[in-house]
């Protein structure tokens, strides 16, 4: 099973991806996690990505497409995967179609989590408070300025993906404002 989760930052894509990974025994491919790992390890690509992420901008397609292509080719993705945070633009979606075709793969579903932007801001504030409460490290892209830029980038560049995937018959929407368990049940109903 090959799934894409769409939705604005803070919508719960990562949480739902982890639940799907456990339920269907498939790999979660979070470009955000892959990029953060590259930044922490201070790889060349990580250094490039850090500049964009900390400013709230999207990482250039050529960087992200290569990371995804390499990761999809790994053995744990043979039985399927969940893409969380990719694609973010129609250009990336078109590149993904080419990548999948070159590997004789196809998507099963694209699920968009629909959420209210004011609620997203509250979710991010809560996430920061929870991390601080346990002495954890706050994500650099969770500061208010970066988050506002990420929402703007999402509206301008990522929202057109809904139309792209709707036009090819893969898009399904789920109310992302429901509690985590209800969102999970709605996603599972789509997939089964």
UniProtKB/Swiss-Prot annotation:
Pfam families referenced in this protein's UniProt entry, alphabetically: ADK (PF00406)
Broad EC category: transferase
Record has Glycoprotein as a keyword = no
List positions binding AMP. 31, 36, 57-59, 85-88, 92, 139, 150
The region called NMP is annotated at 30-59
The protein's assembly and partners: Monomer.
Domain remark in the UniProt entry:
Consists of three domains, a large central CORE domain and two small peripheral domains, NMPbind and LID, which undergo movements during catalysis. The LID domain closes over the site of phosphoryl transfer upon ATP binding. Assembling and dissambling the active center during each catalytic cycle provides an effective means to prevent ATP hydrolysis.
**Protein name, entry field:** Adenylate kinase
**What organism is recorded for this protein?**
Bartonella bacilliformis (strain ATCC 35685 / KC583 / Herrer 020/F12,63)
The top of its lineage is: Bacteria, Pseudomonadati, Pseudomonadota, Alphaproteobacteria, Hyphomicrobiales
In the UniProt record, what gene is named as encoding this protein?
adk
């Amino acid at each position: 099973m090959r799934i894409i989760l769409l939705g604005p930052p803070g919508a719960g894509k990562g949480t739902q991806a982890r639940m799907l990974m456990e339920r269907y025994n498939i790999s979660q491919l979070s470009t955000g996690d892959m990029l953060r790992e590259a930044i922490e390890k201070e790889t060349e690509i990580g250094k490039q990505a850090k500049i964009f992420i900390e400013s709230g901008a999207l990482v250039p397609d050529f960087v992200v497409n290569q990371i995804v292509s390499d990761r999809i080719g790994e053995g744990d993705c043979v039985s399927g995967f969940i893409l969380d945070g990719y694609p973010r633009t129609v250009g990336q979606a078109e590149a993904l179609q080419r990548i999948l075709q070159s590997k004789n793969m196809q998507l099963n579903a694209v699920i968009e989590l629909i959420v209210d932007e004011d609620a997203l801001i509250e979710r991010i504030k809560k996430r920061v408070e929870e991390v601080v409460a346990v002495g954890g490290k706050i994500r650099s892209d969770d500061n208010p300025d970066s988050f506002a830029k990420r929402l703007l980038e999402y509206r301008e560049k990522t929202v057109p993906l809904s139309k792209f995937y709707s036009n090819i018959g893969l898009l399904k929407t789920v109310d992302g404002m429901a509690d985590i368990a209800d969102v999970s049940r709605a996603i599972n109903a789509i997939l089964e």
